[in-house]
């Protein structure tokens, strides 16, 4: 009986409830810059508590970043063992096309609770609308769970989300990406704001605002971030612990006076401040508690 309980605990811990709700992944085929941004109605305090591997924050468990080649989001019933994330990471580094990586992920017995989005330059040199992106949405996810992507000039992107207020969250985010002006990061931020403005995560609203001293601003999530990696940035040992150009995050535990309880609006404030200061390289996020079992094979 004890063995059975332990087994069930490990299974449930590895296939935990949704972390990420919506995310935007993008790559500049000309420069090799890759970006991921995301927001969710999971409080910051919940990430270190995950089993069998805790997480520093949303980005730590969700993002897969390979500078100059590709970026991915692993979300919904997130894999807390990190096996899926590391598989995606290693295959992107090899130049495996996104659609083939998705087929590999389908071997996971819990795949119907997962959601994946991948955008990459398959051979590290060329990119086309047909070979550069792929997504998967498990049948066990909620009704409004989907992905949609496309391109705008040299920018290739995909938006994916689950437990959303409606399909318009993803579609309006994608539309905003294509209508935005400026840098790749500007396009990603526009998509993030559109997702938030169109309902975001249906689990969050001003009724569960944990920072009543700040304006709620129609919040649809608790945490948000954007991570930017340039082509020459150093990749990591894990799927996202490299030395990337910029990382801006908002948690429900680090809000300041003058900011918003809506993390996407505060992310915009912090992003604008970063741009105004010259868009300089930021300090990396703190260390990840996740340690791959065989780091020598992940280099």
Q: Where in the sequence are the language-model features?
A:
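Sec-dependent signal peptide recognition
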Residues: 2-7, 63
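Bacterial N-terminal signal peptides
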Residues: 5-17
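N-terminal nucleophile
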Residues: 19-299
């Amino acid at each position: 009986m004890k063995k059975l309980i332990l087994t069930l605990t490990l299974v449930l811990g590895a296939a935990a409830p949704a972390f990420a709700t919506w995310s935007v992944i993008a790559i500049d085929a000309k420069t090799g810059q890759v970006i991921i941004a995301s927001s969710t109605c999971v409080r910051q305090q919940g990430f270190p508590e995950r089993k069998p591997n805790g997480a520093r924050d949303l980005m730590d468990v969700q993002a897969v970043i390979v500078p100059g080649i590709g970026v991915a989001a692993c979300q919904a019933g997130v894999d807390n063992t990190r096996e899926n994330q590391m598989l995606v990471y290693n295959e992107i580094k090899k130049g495996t096309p996104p659609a083939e990586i998705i087929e590999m992920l389908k071997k996971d017995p819990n795949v119907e609770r997962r959601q994946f989005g991948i955008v990459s330059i398959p051979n590290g040199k060329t990119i086309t609308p047909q070979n550069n992106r792929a997504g998967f949405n498990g049948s066990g996810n909620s009704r409004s769970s989907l992905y949609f992507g496309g391109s705008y000039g040299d920018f290739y992107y995909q938006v994916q989300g689950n437990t959303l207020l409606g399909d318009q969250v993803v579609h309006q985010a994608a539309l905003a990406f294509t209508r935005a002006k400026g840098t790749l990061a500007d396009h990603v931020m526009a998509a993030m704001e559109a997702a938030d403005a169109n309902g975001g995560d249906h689990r969050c609203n001003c009724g569960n605002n944990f920072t009543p001293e700040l304006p709620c601003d129609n919040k649809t999530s608790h945490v948000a971030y954007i991570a930017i990696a340039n082509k020459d940035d150093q990749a990591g040992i894990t799927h996202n612990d490299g030395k990337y150009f910029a990382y801006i995050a908002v948690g429900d535990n680090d809000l300041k006076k003058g900011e918003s309880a809506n993390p996407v609006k505060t992310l915009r404030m912090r992003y604008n401040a970063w741009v105004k200061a010259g868009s300089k390289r930021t300090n990396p996020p703190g260390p990840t508690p996740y340690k791959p079992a065989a780091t020598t094979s992940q280099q």
